[in-house]
Curated annotation (Swiss-Prot):
Segments traversing the membrane: 3-23
Membrane topology summary: Single-pass membrane protein
Stored Pfam families: FloA
Keywords on record: Cell membrane, Membrane, Transmembrane, Transmembrane helix
Main location: membrane
Cellular localization per UniProt: Cell membrane; Membrane raft
Annotated source species: Desulforapulum autotrophicum (strain ATCC 43914 / DSM 3382 / VKM B-1955 / HRM2) (Desulfobacterium autotrophicum)
Name recorded for this polypeptide: Flotillin-like protein FloA
């Protein structure tokens, strides 16, 4: 009796465990069976052990079958285990099939694993996207600055989504083309009169090579006149030349002042030499007296000459007014 009770308890526990693992899988199996997806019950059960969500795989399989796509369950599982978005890939395949775009599962999975939004790429292939460039400033040959904004219509190229450049490259190339076109114009009026000249020139350069997009059109949304860069450059150059000339003039003035001071110093030096020479005269006269080369009459005659010279100088020089006299 006790043995029978133990067996019954074990059977009940076994049934509970089986229902725990199979119970939720049965509903998914029935759902797939009714939808014609044909996902095996054991396959659904063992998905849990493979760390794969059964509901996601079964739902994706049903969506693919209902849309007429033949994709195996193993492909869904392998893509999920690789880190891909199974639901987005299935939706992209369905959208591509409805739009008559050749997109195999392997290519869609590769695009998804590369980090691209494959569903958005398919939608952009059907409905092109408009990208607006930021404000681009460039200067024409006459020195006038022009500011332009353009709208680029692009369509996704599914064949180049893996390894192709993104929107940033398109914007950079278009901006470079606009700057080159405006810079090569002889006058800013030429660009203002023919804005389509920019779009035609830029579009003819094949800017979409090596990118994941195909440029359909480039439209100039707005062109504004900016600063007169040429005049500003000339003004700055004139101001710089003025400062250089002022610096050179200041240098010449400093040199002239230094030379003037040097000449004054030389004059003082010459005067000092004269005074020194005059101081040697009495010594020379005394030596002449001792040697007998100069007599007393000669000495007085020389004194008379000096006195006459001083008198003539005093007569020739006008007297200065004495400020102390009333």
């Amino acid at each position: 009796m006790e043995f029978t009770t133990i067996v019954v308890i074990l059977l009940v526990i076994a049934c509970i465990v089986v229902l725990f693992f199979i119970g939720s899988s049965i509903s998914l199996w029935v759902q797939s069976l009714v939808s014609g997806a044909r996902v095996g019950l054991l396959n659904i059960v063992f998905m849990r052990f493979r760390k794969v969500p059964p509901k996601l795989i079964v739902t994706s399989k049903i969506m693919a079958v209902k849309s007429g796509l033949e994709i195996s369950t193993d492909d869904f599982e392998s893509h999920y285990l690789a880190g891909g978005d199974v639901s987005r890939v299935v939706k992209a395949l369905i959208a591509a099939d409805k739009a008559n775009i050749d997109l195999p599962f392997n290519r869609a999975a590769a695009i998804d694993l590369a980090g691209r939004n494959v569903l958005e790429a398919v939608q952009m292939s059907v409905n092109p996207k408009v990208i607006e460039t930021p404000l681009i400033a460039a200067m024409a040959k006459d020195g006038i600055q022009l500011k332009a904004i353009s709208r680029v219509t692009v369509r996704a190229n599914i064949d180049r989504l893996v390894g192709g450049a993104g929107e940033e490259t398109i914007l950079a190339r278009v901006g470079e083309g606009i700057v080159t076109t405006i810079g090569s114009a002889n006058s800013h009026k030429m660009v203002l009169e023919n804005p389509d000249l920019i779009s035609k020139t830029v579009l003819s350069k094949g800017l979409d090579s090596g990118t994941a997009y195909e440029i359909l059109s480039i439209d100039i949304a707005d062109v504004d006149v900016g600063k007169n860069i040429g005049a500003e450059l000339e003004t700055d150059r004139a101001e710089a030349d003025k400062k250089i000339a002022q610096a050179k003039a200041e240098e010449r003035r400093a040199m002239a002042y230094a030379m003037e001071q040097e000449m004054k110093a030389r004059v003082q030096e010459m005067r000092a030499k004269v005074v020194e020479a005059e101081a040697q005269v009495p010594l020379a006269m005394a030596e002449a007296f001792r040697q007998g080369n100069l007599g007393i009459m000669d000495y007085y005659r020389m004194k008379n000459i000096v006195s006459d010279t001083d008198m003539r100088q005093s007569i020739a020089t006008p007297e200065k007014d004495d400020p102390d006299q009333p």
